[in-house]
Design a protein with these regions (language model features):
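N-terminal cap/lid segment of alpha/beta-hydrolase-fold proteins
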Residues: 1-23
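Alpha/beta-hydrolase active-site loop
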Residues: 76-96
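The serine-hydrolase catalytic nucleophile loop
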Residues: 37-48, 63
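Catalytic active-site module of serine/aspartate enzymes centered on a nucleophile-bearing elbow/loop
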Residues: 270-274, 279-310
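Short beta-strand/loop motif that positions the catalytic acidic residue
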Residues: 226, 232-234
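Conserved alpha/beta-hydrolase
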Residues: 50-68
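Primarily recognizes the serine-hydrolase "nucleophile elbow" in alpha/beta-hydrolase
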Residues: 91-97, 101-155
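Accessory cap/linker subdomain of secreted extracellular hydrolases
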Residues: 131-221
């Protein structure tokens, strides 16, 4: 069963869809947190269907400025995104048949920063799942991504060095608050360079403003305050996220939190989308076959039903 819902975060109206499994409940539930860029509620359709068959309700929503939601995601900080995720948890908690004490956040990519941050802000988050989430800052991740994307594409080392030099120079200007139109004009002068597409932005000042806002976010302090169960999964072949460093930082920070209920998994052969190497001509490999089985099995243990009163 699916129903359209509306909820608010700091005056911005957001629209999404709740999926409920059969039966009266109360059911555990999952709120999905998208990664970077624009995204609508259908981003997690496959995962929501699997969870519904396993007895979980879920909520996916249009990011600000996408689909039926107001606002603009590029105006947000990661703290704003975390507040939005908590508003989604509150929306789920108010749905018929949902157990408000058993709601998890599942964040993918950039959502892997948002989920733990939200959990560090509110006990309403009962568990956190991070899929390909980074344990380093957005700036450090972007340096890693640009370098590894270019090398993976076979770009010459002098071009890789030129790209990284520009990236560092642009970051310095963004940090000190230089005029964004001037920063963008300087960037666009390089748009014919071999390395330019690896910058991965849409060439508008709004995106530069968003990056400047989040560049130096350190996920460790939030992770150090997360005491609910955490599942983090990475792909060994991820060229977007430094997997070894991320897993190490997750483990250290959650250890400092005294969190005894976390599980960290690195899947051999998988990429950032948790897909295996492609076998067909479309260049897109299959999803890890047992990914959602792993997630649902873990969720059942992390969100057990309350014991019947004696």
């Amino acid at each position: 069963m699916t129903i359209e819902v509306k909820f608010e975060n700091h005056g911005t109206q957001l629209t999404g869809v709740v999926r409920r499994p059969g039966g009266d409940g109360p059911h555990p539930a999952v709120a999905f947190v998208d990664g970077s860029g624009p995204a609508e509620r259908d981003s997690f359709d496959e995962e929501a269907d699997v969870l519904a068959r396993a007895g979980f309700a879920s909520l996916a929503w249009d990011k600000p400025g996408c689909g039926g939601s107001g606002g603009d995601w590029r105006d947000q900080s990661l703290q704003d995104r975390a507040a939005e995720a908590l508003a989604a948890v509150d929306c789920l908690a108010g749905q018929d048949g949902v157990d408000p004490g058993r709601i998890a956040l599942l964040g993918a990519s950039q959502g892997g920063w948002v989920g733990p941050l939200a959990a560090s802000m509110s006990a309403t988050v009962a568990a956190v799942i991070s899929l390909s989430g980074s344990g380093v800052s957005p700036y450090a991740q972007e340096v890693y991504r640009v370098e590894h994307m270019l090398r993976d594409a076979g770009v010459a080392e002098d071009q890789v060095a030129e790209a990284l030099a520009f990236f560092h120079r642009r970051a310095t200007r963004l940090r000190r608050g230089d005029d964004l139109e001037e920063v963008l004009a300087d960037q666009l002068r390089h748009q014919d360079a071999t390395w330019y597409p690896a910058l991965g932005d849409d060439g508008v000042v709004e995106h530069l403003a968003f990056m400047a806002r989040i560049y130096d976010y350190d996920p460790a302090p939030a992770l150090e305050r997360v005491t609910c169960p955490v599942l983090a999964i990475w792909g060994e072949r991820d060229i977007y996220v430094p997997v070894a460093a991320s897993a190490e930082r997750f483990a250290a920070a959650l250890g400092r939190a005294g969190n005894g209920s976390f599980r960290l998994e690195v899947v051999a052969g998988a990429d950032h989308g948790l897909r295996l190497p492609p076998t067909g001509g479309d260049g897109r490999g299959p999803r890890i076959p047992d990914l959602m089985d792993m997630v649902t099995t873990w969720l059942r243990r992390a969100l057990p039903p309350a014991p019947d009163p004696a």
